[in-house]
């Protein structure tokens, strides 16, 4: 057991200690505010306070974990053996920065509560983040810091028992649009033909007609292909279904469509499933609950997983709404505009509500890469995608974290927009499962 001296306790401190020491370092710990108890303890220990006591491992504590509410944070930057860090303290200390405050700042998404600009979809922009501006968005620094600090502890206390986590890969698939042409209903189909005529898009008219006449496979119907790939590479997969009312940014097949319901049920036979809360659910109250109830009815079982359509998160409101409808796990934590680690971590963690100063029961699973990021935001050629994924994957494997990818059924269609992305996905499964 590891004993930690603290000069003061707080909900924030307990939260980050449980995550950082308990989960990431795999070490059981207790805290004490009694200096004499700490000095007389002969076992493994370190000091997290404002003053060093003897010659123990010492981390200077900044104010963040003992504050309440949101305040502008002033911190210095440093590097720790080449790894970027902030809340810098002094090079003479065992660790030259307050790694617990820095970790809490990132994982709690403290900066997303501060004043910031939002994008056209009312999302926090990655360019506002400290990870982006300081150049460590592509590194799971919280995991790296935990691994390095664990080495310091074990070097002094080699007999201290600790657990080691194992690397894991999870593929997640968003079904925003189950089919390109099928099951759209008469009015939507007529409207689509009209738009194609106005745009002189003859190839799409021909393709749509062939699919509707069953002379050609619907290009977005890639479900058998995905099943074969996931089975071949022994992949854990989660499908998220968009069941929102039709709107400008919510254009899936109607939830009343029996073939769509059958598709959902068939995918749920061999994979985990979750709700993909619609764009509209972030605007109109009550929609989220309705969508969860619809999926529950189709699956005939409790729905506990979610990922926001368009990755729309507004803290703490979005997560509070999920908790209110009994969602237990969310997979939205990532950026649309860039790849990497939005919360600086590649392991799951509980959402800490900074407004209420409480650890919630909602588990956050951060993802690292999304197909649409490469295609629409980074605008890279398909040949470059795997080379951008590999370094992130290596970072996650090095710290025994969890690598989560976000793909869509339509990006495996090999249509003109997604040409080359089918082979990219298979290569991703191959290297991520190795």
Predicted regions and their residues:
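Terminal accessory/targeting
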Residues: 1-255, 347, 354, 358-434
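Catalytic domains of cell-wall/extracellular-matrix polysaccharide-remodeling enzymes
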Residues: 13, 281-358, 416-418
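Conserved hydrophobic/aromatic pocket- or pore-lining residues that grip, position, or stack substrates
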Residues: 174, 276, 322
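Metal-dependent polysaccharide deacetylase catalytic core of the NodB/CE4 family, i.e.
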Residues: 177, 181, 202-204, 224-313
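Glycine-centered flexibility motif
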Residues: 270-274, 338-342, 401
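Short acidic/histidine-rich active-site segments
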Residues: 274-276, 332-334, 406-408
């Amino acid at each position: 057991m590891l004993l930690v001296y603290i000069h003061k306790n707080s909900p924030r401190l307990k939260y980050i200690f449980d995550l950082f020491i308990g989960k990431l370092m795999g070490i059981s710990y207790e805290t004490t505010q009694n200096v004499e108890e700490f000095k007389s303890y002969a076992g493994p220990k370190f000091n997290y306070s404002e003053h060093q006591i003897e010659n123990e491992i010492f981390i200077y504590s900044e104010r963040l974990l003992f504050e309440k509410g949101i305040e502008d944070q002033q911190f210095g930057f440093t590097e720790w053996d080449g790894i970027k860090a902030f809340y810098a303290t002094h090079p003479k200390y065992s660790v030259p920065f307050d790694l617990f405050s820095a970790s809490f700042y990132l994982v709690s998404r403290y900066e997303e509560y501060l004043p910031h600009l939002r994008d056209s979809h009312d999302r926090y922009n990655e360019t506002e983040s400290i990870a982006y501006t300081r150049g460590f968005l592509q590194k799971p620094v919280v995991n790296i810091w935990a691994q390095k600090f664990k080495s310091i502890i074990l070097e002094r206390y080699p007999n201290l028992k600790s657990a080691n986590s194992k690397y894991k890969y999870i593929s997640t698939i968003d079904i925003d649009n189950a089919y390109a042409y099928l099951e759209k209903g008469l009015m939507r189909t007529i409207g689509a033909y009209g738009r194609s005529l106005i745009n002189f898009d003859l190839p799409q008219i021909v393709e749509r007609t062939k699919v509707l006449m069953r002379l050609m496979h619907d290009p977005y119907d890639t479900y058998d292909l995905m099943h074969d790939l996931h089975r071949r590479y022994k992949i854990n997969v989660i499908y998220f279904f968009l069941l929102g009312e039709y709107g400008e940014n919510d254009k899936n097949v109607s939830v009343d469509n029996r073939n769509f319901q059958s598709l959902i049920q068939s995918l749920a036979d061999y994979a985990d499933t979750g709700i993909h809360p619609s764009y509209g659910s972030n605007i109109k109250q009550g929609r989220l609950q309705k969508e969860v109830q619809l999926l529950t009815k189709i699956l005939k079982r409790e729905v506990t997983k979610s990922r926001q359509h368009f990755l729309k998160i507004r803290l703490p409101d979005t997560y509070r709404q999920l908790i209110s409808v009994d969602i237990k796990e969310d997979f939205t934590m990532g950026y649309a505009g860039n790849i990497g680690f939005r919360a600086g971590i590649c392991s799951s963690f509980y959402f800490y509500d900074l407004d209420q100063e409480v650890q919630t029961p909602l588990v956050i699973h951060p993802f690292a890469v999304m197909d649409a990021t490469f295609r629409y935001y980074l605008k890279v050629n398909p040949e470059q995608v795997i080379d951008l994924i590999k370094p992130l994957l290596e970072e996650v494997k090095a710290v025994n974290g969890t690598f989560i990818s976000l793909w869509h059924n339509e990006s495996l269609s090999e249509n003109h927009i997604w040409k080359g992305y089918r082979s990219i996905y298979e290569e991703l499964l191959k290297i991520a499962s190795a």
